[in-house]
Amino acid sequence: MVTIVLNKYKLLNKIGIGQQKLEDLLFNLKSEIKPVDESNIEIEINADRLDLLSSDGIARAIKGLLEKELGEAKYDITDTEYKLIVDNVRTRPYALAAVIYNAKIDLQELIQFQEKLHSTIGRKRKKVAIGIHDLKKIDSKRIEYREVPLSYKFIPLYEKEELTISEVLEKTEQGKLYGNISISNGVSPAIVQEDGEVLSIPPIINSDKTKLDESTKDLFIDVTGTSFEAVAQTLDIIVSNLAEAGGTIGRVKVIKTDNSFQQSSPLLIHKIQNVREEYANKILGIKISEEEICKHITRMRMNCNVENGIIRVTVPQYRVDIINEIDIVEDIAMSIGYNNLEPSKYISTNYGSYDYLTLLERKMRELSIGAGFVEVFNFVLIKNEKILDSKYVKILNPISEEYNAVRNSLIPILLDFLSKNQHAKFPIRIFETGDVVIYDSSTDTGFRNDKRAAYAIMDNKVSYEDVQAPIHYILKTLGIEVNYKEENNDIFIEGRSASIVYENEKIGVIGEINPDVLIRFGIEYPTVIAELYITEIAKKLNKR
């Protein structure tokens, strides 16, 4: 959910209803109201409804439910002489722009709208950043988006003196928060006038030159980012909501310097989504006609018509949450009102139960405890430096470097556990069962989940046989007669390791840990480990 704060009286006046009616209609739109003070309300909005993140977007939607306005909202659009020349900006290659004329602007609400878009579709400005400028303070109709050196100077928003971009990164709060997103190789993306004067350094900060004030009515809006689709959608939403406030949308000619793109912006992208009458009725559990379906769709501010028995919905540019047929059906439910839909009873002829893999894992845990091992629980994520195999899943944006990869074996994580518990009373006998993600070229992703169990013993003196005996007992109790086939593995001492084989298939490994591996983990005592592949064992046993 996304939370916005709006002036209650301004919103009610825009729609022409009372607060209770507003609460009821917002509930239909999956939103809730909480009072903040006498004048302001807090509204929780579903994160996919970006068009509702301002009072104008909310008013547009509710006017549809009230049938004051039906179908897609129509806005005044005009061509302008403004051009945005887009150069090769390596860290944020995509940019679009638009002009808004004569909009009724609430500065506080506009800034909130901008920041909520930054935090949602913009992924905290990493994916999309928005610059909003007072159009009358821009001196040229040719605007450029290009890279500039960090020595480039301009006056940042709310500052009095010129700073270099390097100084902005060091001295301003915005620079500290967002400077690492787009700076690379000593250059930064920049929106500049034809004479080179900076208008903004996306995604960090605007220039003070084009600062908005209470007299601002005309806007120049730039949107930059790493995804063209997200950039286009963001700009479409902004200009649509500002046009709802009475503004006229001005098109800007966007031209790539390599001539790979030349188009008027905003794109105002519409799409056609077909809906089947029988599908909608089945999902909703009701019986309504094609005409009734179309009526509800127009109440949700989309156009609808029926052609040869097919319901065609024109999805406007501000409804980026509509992806496929089920989203249209959800909108029909909102128009009808969830309170007006009767919940159907779920009747099942089956009953739930654990699958065989889960039952086998539970049985192995019981047997492992009975064999004298203590169960430990570790995270599925691990530091990649601790992984002993080169084929693993690495996380591109980890919260911590300690958890930047997904484990592909339980052996490293048990060794890591032992390294931190060498002070404990010997012998240390531990085991863990859990998921790993292993390389598999036959899958769509190249990896698959696997369930495993691993056993480790650390003592002043310990050998292969100390772990083989309990493993053999556990497997035999499960009705599994295995063979041990010598196998050399860098993890283990040469000649002191084996693969565990059942019905000619490898179901595990066992051995004495190589001293080099022990040194790598900071372990000072001999250690033996076995790992069993529960998923493979389950496949074998389940066929019996």
UniProtKB/Swiss-Prot annotation:
Cellular location of this protein?
Answer: Cytoplasm
**CDD domains reported in the protein's UniProt record:** PheRS_beta_core (cd00769)
* The family this protein is said to belong to: Belongs to the phenylalanyl-tRNA synthetase beta subunit family. Type 2 subfamily.
Annotated positions binding Mg(2+): 321, 327, 330-331
B5 domain sequence ranges: 268-343
Q: Pfam families per the record?
A: B3_4, B5, tRNA_synthFbeta
| PROSITE patterns hit by this protein | B5 (PS51483)
The record's catalysed reaction(s) read:
tRNA(Phe) + L-phenylalanine + ATP = L-phenylalanyl-tRNA(Phe) + AMP + diphosphate + H(+)
| SMART domains reported in the protein's UniProt record | B3_4, B5
Gene3D superfamilies xrefs? 3.30.56.10, Bira Bifunctional Protein, Domain 2, Phenylalanyl-trna Synthetase, Chain B, domain 3
The protein's required cofactor(s) are namely: Mg(2+)
Task: Report the PANTHER family cross-referenced here.
Answer: PHENYLALANINE--TRNA LIGASE BETA SUBUNIT, PHENYLALANYL-TRNA SYNTHETASE BETA CHAIN AND LEUCINE-RICH REPEAT-CONTAINING PROTEIN 47
A GO molecular function for this record? ATP binding
As recorded in UniProt, its EC number(s) are 6.1.1.20
Q: Which keywords, in A-to-Z order, does the entry hold? A: Aminoacyl-tRNA synthetase, ATP-binding, Cytoplasm, Ligase, Magnesium, Metal-binding, Nucleotide-binding, Protein biosynthesis
This chain's protein is named Phenylalanine--tRNA ligase beta subunit
Q: Name one GO cellular component term.
A: phenylalanine-tRNA ligase complex
Q: How does it assemble?
A: Tetramer of two alpha and two beta subunits.
Where is this chain primarily localised?
cytoplasm
Biological process GO terms, please? phenylalanyl-tRNA aminoacylation
